[in-house]
């Protein structure tokens, strides 16, 4: 299958969803050589992957992932990475805040790729056991409204792709597959992207993958997040319909920040930023978390406007709920480690 797929893509022909899923299955099963994998990834990059190709590849990744118990009405807050902005962990902090409102969040993430601190790095620095089994993570989702699914633990088949990606050294379809391959199969998703041209295609991909409500966002300062330093371009998926619009921080009563205000550092430094936000510190770091948490709450609860989501996130922080919930989460993680030990 992979030989025929390479030939088609080299000739600038598009693969169907089914063809892409089948050829990725070959790669994920270790049945393709590194040369074949590199050839396919290079040809897809040169052609530009279609919606069907991205969705088919994501479906294959999901099917080869470590199984996660079936969940309903679960939210994901995630970015593609690759914006080279070195911000603190905005989406991870936002996920902690959103979970404290009673909304279930299954956060799928990895260690840092283009930054100093990925979701796994900062959560580990906060004291969470990032290597929890699916059963334990599912239990955490039910008890604490928050679970972390460590990509390295769930996507073992990526071992057949990782060396090729490293040697190629340029962006491939896999740079956008991570946020689409959450084993919890989220029904609602706030997805940040590093390139504005990805907004509409990835909104359509999410639709194909069964996501019912989503916002795909790109900060025009380059962030793969809702930004407070510039406008944010949005494509929203709701009821099978896509809507394009832009937002500014000012329209939600938030001050415009400088990009320098949002820069983070090591996992330990970013963990301290998260702790300060959860403890009630005000300023640009809190504001960008409020914006992203508010958008995520709108995605999870469409009857709630972004502004109402921001207000709820602010009240939740001021009531110390995220701080208390994070303490419960860490206590739960420690308890489960003791049980396993």
Curated annotation (Swiss-Prot):
EC number: 2.4.2.18
GO cellular component, one term: cytosol
Binding site for Mg(2+) 1: 91, 225
GO MF, one annotated term: magnesium ion binding
Pathway membership: Amino-acid biosynthesis; L-tryptophan biosynthesis; L-tryptophan from chorismate: step 2/5
List of residues binding anthranilate 1: 79, 110
CC cofactor note: Binds 2 magnesium ions per monomer.
Residues reported in the UniProt entry to bind Mg(2+) 2: 224-225
Sites where the protein binds 5-phospho-alpha-D-ribose 1-diphosphate: 79, 82-83, 87, 89-92, 107-115, 119
Domain of life: Bacteria
Family: Belongs to the anthranilate phosphoribosyltransferase family.
Protein name in UniProt: Anthranilate phosphoribosyltransferase
Organism lineage string: Bacteria, Bacillati, Bacillota, Bacilli, Lactobacillales
